[in-house]
Amino acid sequence: MREIKFRAWEKSNEDLGIDAEEVIKREMIYFYLGDLYWLGEETGDYSFPFDHHVMQYIGLKDKNGKDIYEGDILKDQYTSMIDRVCFDAGRFCIYKSGKGLYKYHPNNLEVIGNIHENPELL
């Protein structure tokens, strides 16, 4: 079974060092719709703008031993492919190709950035 971990990007401060588990606990996220998160309490449901983007660890490490998260930008050392990791159709995959990450060997992949701090890499 893979380890479940998250990281969070704080939009207003452009900071990736946010403790995602604390964000999740503090905000009690139920589900996401656009840029609003819907919460539930005993008094009823309400929504609010959410200032964090939460990304999940995919359970793999790159060739340097760095954890890979959705939103990371990967480079394949053999094909020179550069693309981002996304979650689609119940699996983590490479965005443009749509190929599941199982088609790539993690020892050939390197995290070179992420979509928030390094969008120019795409």
Summary of predicted features, one role per range:
Residues 1-122:
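Secondary-structure transition motif
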